[in-house]
């Protein structure tokens, strides 16, 4: 077993005792840091940065040099799988991700194969291996993927969407086509995350960014059942240690019980749910991750500390089973010093809850 100097994040996910609440931030390696912008400029563009193991490791470690974070997260993108399936991902200025060959019909779905994690996606595994080496056992490394539903939204819409009309048209007019796509994606995510674990990821997270646009019935049919399949297919022990799995559905507060029933170790919360309510509903079954509004990082240091204190109080005295995080990714124009206030406030203010 690889010795970790700080394993609080892993212990909290498994509801084991810790001496303070561990914290990391979604998108903690990113554009709010000037050093990230410099490294990205050196790489040339976003995907070139992802595909260079040394530079991907550099940007993964940058926030850890600034802040006493309790975990590192692989620097990559959720759209690596569809890109490797041949949909030709590019990032257009002002538009975000665009697929030049989107999925439009059943024939398109039948044509795509499962990418080889050590073939078309080997650059991701190389980054995992490099990051683990460079971390030198300081903190655990989180691997991740998008959920099948969320990946499918980009693949069918051809990029980002506000109304999701194309994928919902497929969902209601050709549900069997969408299920075929989601099933392929679930198999691909299982292979991809298991390869990340074998390469060195010590925990994995599935981001279901767009699950919250579905009706309760459709959420279960088109998103949750495929995340359940992923949880069932993942390696859960590696290098002598359990590999915790976190599921996160943005705007998924109404489905916490169903998410917890998948067999995951932790459920990610966005800021639209009260953490005390979430704990009352599922805290006996899983750990919780979250859940400060990322926009709170625009506030004064005093207000940030006040918000952290309120969330810690909401989680309460039984201080095991909470990983502090934002409710979604940090915004690109947040002052880095405010992120530092946040991280240090979590450590300082959580200690009384862990006596």
Curated annotation (Swiss-Prot):
Output the Gene Ontology cellular-component terms.
Answer: cytosol
Instruction: Tell me the GO molecular function terms.
Output: uroporphyrinogen decarboxylase activity
Species, as recorded? Vibrio campbellii (strain ATCC BAA-1116)
Which residues of this UniProt protein bind substrate?
A: 27-31, 77, 154, 209, 328
Q: What is this protein called?
A: Uroporphyrinogen decarboxylase
Catalytic activity, as annotated: uroporphyrinogen III + 4 H(+) = coproporphyrinogen III + 4 CO2
Pathway entry: Porphyrin-containing compound metabolism; protoporphyrin-IX biosynthesis; coproporphyrinogen-III from 5-aminolevulinate: step 4/4
Q: Which Pfam families match?
A: URO-D (PF01208)
Q: According to its UniProt record, which protein family does this protein belong to?
A: Belongs to the uroporphyrinogen decarboxylase family.
């Amino acid at each position: 077993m690889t010795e970790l100097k700080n394993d609080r994040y892993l212990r909290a996910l498994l509801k084991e005792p810790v001496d303070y609440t561990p914290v990391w931030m979604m998108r903690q390696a990113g554009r709010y840091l000037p050093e990230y912008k410099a490294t990205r400029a050196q790489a040339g563009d976003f995907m070139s940065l992802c595909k260079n193991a040394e530079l991907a490791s550099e940007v993964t470690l940058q926030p850890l040099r600034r802040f006493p974070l309790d975990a590192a997260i692989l620097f990559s993108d959720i759209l690596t799988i569809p890109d490797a399936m041949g949909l030709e991902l590019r990032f257009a200025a002002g538009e975000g991700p665009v697929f030049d060959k989107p999925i439009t019909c059943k024939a398109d779905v039948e044509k795509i194969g499962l990418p080889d994690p050590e073939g078309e996606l080997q650059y991701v595994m190389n980054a995992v291996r490099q990051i683990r080496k460079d971390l030198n056992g300081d903190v655990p490394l989180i691997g991740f993927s998008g959920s099948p539903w969320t990946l499918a939204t980009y693949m069918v819409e051809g990029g980002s969407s506000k109304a999701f009309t194309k994928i919902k048209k497929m969902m209601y007019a050709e549900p069997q086509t969408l299920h075929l796509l989601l099933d392929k994606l679930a198999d691909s995510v299982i292979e991809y995350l298991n390869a990340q674990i074998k390469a060195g990821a010590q925990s994995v997270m599935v981001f279901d960014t767009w699950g919250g646009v579905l009706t309760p019935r459709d959420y279960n049919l088109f998103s949750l059942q495929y995340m359940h399949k992923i949880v069932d297919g993942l390696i859960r022990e590696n290098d002598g240690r359990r590999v915790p799995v976190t599921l996160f559905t943005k705007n998924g507060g109404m489905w916490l019980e169903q998410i917890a029933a998948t067999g995951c170790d932790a459920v990610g919360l966005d800021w639209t749910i009260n953490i005390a309510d979430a704990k009352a509903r599922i805290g006996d079954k899983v750990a919780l991750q979250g859940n400060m509004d990322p926009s709170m990082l625009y506030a004064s240091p005093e207000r940030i500390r006040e918000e952290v204190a309120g969330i810690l109080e909401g989680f309460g005295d039984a201080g095991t089973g909470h990983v502090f995080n934002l409710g979604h990714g940090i915004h690109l124009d947040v002052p880095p010093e405010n992120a530092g206030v946040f991280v240090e406030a979590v450590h300082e203010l959580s200690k009384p809850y862990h006596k």
